[in-house]
Amino acid sequence: MSGGQLIRDASARDADACAAIYAPYVTGTAITFESDPPSPAQMAERIAAAAREHAWVVLEADGRVVGYAYGGPYKSRAAYRWSCEVSVYLERGRRRTGGGRALYDALFSRLAARGFRTAVAGMTLPNEASVGLHRALGFEPVGTYRRIGWKHGAWHDVAWTQRPITPNTDEPPDDLR
């Protein structure tokens, strides 16, 4: 990345910034169905959990965290273990700057190195920015849950998409790394 931007693995020291980026999405939008913003301590736990089994990356601009992306479990059944659910969040005003793409590219590289094959992403509709980003990154629509979540006095649909992280043409490794 250029212009004073850097993508790196997240750590507990990024929890305050990640919590601050996420809070407006929780309180002011239906983009996430969480109803209470996580505390920095809760965010630190999420970062640690993702780092253990998947990945969590942050985008720094001029030494300050302005976005993050992470992978987590898709479903708990063993057959799904090579698939993961991914999300990306950027500080307000940072959309359409290439940060989301850069975060996902770095995330997919780390997930591929751990043996993951497929990424799944859900997005509350309408959300043109997220739909456009995921489409541009090769995510394909696989279905929409209609009126699945109630937030801010309205029902919301969630579109689900998926894309390969690595080719799924062979048998998966015995274990994830």
PLM feature spans:
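Conserved acetyl-CoA-binding loop-helix of GNAT-fold acetyltransferases
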Residues: 96-110, 132-136
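Conserved GNAT acetyl-CoA-binding A-motif
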Residues: 111-123
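A short beta-loop-alpha structural element at the N-terminal edge
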Residues: 6-18
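Conserved beta-strand-loop-alpha-helix junction that forms the acyl-donor binding cleft
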Residues: 95, 121-131
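Conserved catalytic-core motifs of GNAT/GCN5-like acyltransferases
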Residues: 70-73, 120-123, 135, 140-157, ...
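Helix-loop element at the rim of GNAT/NAT acetyltransferase active sites that forms part
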Residues: 20-37
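Acetyl-CoA-dependent GNAT
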Residues: 35-93, 104-105, 164-165
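Glycine-rich phosphate/pyrophosphate-binding loop shared by adenosine-nucleotide-utilizing enzymes
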Residues: 5, 64-68, 156
